[in-house]
Amino acid sequence: MYYPLLSIALGSVLGAWLRWLLGLKLNPIYPQIPLGTVTVNLAGGFIIGFAMAYFAHSDLSPNYKLFVITGFCGALTTFSTFSIEIVTLLQSGKWGMAMLAISIHLIGSLIFTCLGLATYYWVAGN
């Protein structure tokens, strides 16, 4: 029971540190589109795709998968999880469900971001 928890925790620490570092270094370059965020989202998508394929053909302990996918990619970006879910739907020929999931994630995220901002300003009295 402890090895899975430690695997996730260690991966999470490393993913979060990398996200923070890339944000610090890359976001100031072109603030209109935070390059650190774009970089971690694209890298996370690549890493999770590669890792899912690799672990599907590997005899490694499941703890390595927890370290890379759940821990590292989960802390680096949640976009990587979203990406693999959409690609899995597309590979299964579920184009309609993939488009629906994309719409829900994208529109839902924007709506909840706006709701979060509005809630803050409402609570703060601004």
Swiss-Prot record:
The chain crosses the membrane at residues 4-24, 33-53, 67-87, 97-117. GO terms for biological process: cellular detoxification of fluoride. InterPro entries: FluC. Belongs to the fluoride channel Fluc/FEX (TC 1.A.43) family. Disulfide bonds: none annotated. Na(+) is not transported, but it plays an essential structural role and its presence is essential for fluoride channel function. Fluoride-specific ion channel. Important for reducing fluoride concentration in the cell, thus reducing its toxicity. NCBIfam families: crcB (TIGR00494), PRK14196.1 (NF010792). It is a multi-pass membrane protein. The keyword Membrane applies. GO terms for molecular function: fluoride channel activity; metal ion binding. It comes from the Bacteria. GO terms for cellular component: plasma membrane. It is found in: Cell inner membrane. This is Fluoride-specific ion channel FluC. PANTHER family: FLUORIDE EXPORT PROTEIN 1-RELATED. Pfam families: CRCB. It catalyses: fluoride(in) = fluoride(out).
